Amino acid sequence: MFGLGGAPQISSEQKLQAAEAELDMVTGMFNQLVDQCHSKCINKSYGDSDITKQEALCLDRCVAKYFDTNVQVGEHMQKLGQSGQFMGRK
């Protein structure tokens, strides 16, 4: 009641800004994933009209590694944030 001791209220505009920022982050991550895995796995000459088995396997592994790495980095950053070491704090 009266905003004492409760969680602060977030306006609709703040929610929209947060959603847009999250969408931008996810879109950026997706574009980075596509760029990296495409340049690593897809032959530049495009000799076949379809993705080869070798390219598909490479793409599968590349995407899996990318997401595994993101999870590991996220967990590490969360631990640093909880311990106060994130952003140069010790």
From Swiss-Prot:
UniProt keyword list: Chaperone, Disulfide bond, Membrane, Metal-binding, Mitochondrion, Mitochondrion inner membrane, Protein transport, Translocation, Transport, Zinc
Entry keyword annotation includes Transport: yes
Pfam families, A to Z: zf-Tim10_DDP (PF02953)
UniProt topology in membrane: Peripheral membrane protein
GO BP term (any one): protein insertion into mitochondrial inner membrane
Main location: mitochondrion
An example molecular function term from Gene Ontology annotations: metal ion binding
Keyword set includes Secreted: no
Transmembrane segments: none
Motif Twin CX3C motif per UniProt: ranges: 37-62
GO cellular component: mitochondrial inner membrane
Location of this chain's protein in the cell: Mitochondrion inner membrane
Disulfide bonds: C37-C62, C41-C58
Cross-referenced PANTHER family: MITOCHONDRIAL IMPORT INNER MEMBRANE TRANSLOCASE SUBUNIT TIM10
Functional description taken from the UniProt entry: Mitochondrial intermembrane chaperone that participates in the import and insertion of multi-pass transmembrane proteins into the mitochondrial inner membrane. Also required for the transfer of beta-barrel precursors from the TOM complex to the sorting and assembly machinery (SAM complex) of the outer membrane. Acts as a chaperone-like protein that protects the hydrophobic precursors from aggregation and guide them through the mitochondrial intermembrane space.
Family: Belongs to the small Tim family.
Description of how the protein assembles with itself and partners: Heterohexamer; composed of 3 copies of TIM9 and 3 copies of TIM10, named soluble 70 kDa complex. Associates directly with the TIM22 complex, whose core is composed of TIM22 and TIM54. Interacts with the transmembrane regions of multi-pass transmembrane proteins in transit.
Domain notes: The twin CX3C motif contains 4 conserved Cys residues that form 2 disulfide bonds in the mitochondrial intermembrane space. However, during the transit of TIM10 from cytoplasm into mitochondrion, the Cys residues probably coordinate zinc, thereby preventing folding and allowing its transfer across mitochondrial outer membrane.
Protein known as: Mitochondrial import inner membrane translocase subunit Tim10
Organism of origin: Pichia sorbitophila (strain ATCC MYA-4447 / BCRC 22081 / CBS 7064 / NBRC 10061 / NRRL Y-12695) (Hybrid yeast)
Gene: TIM10
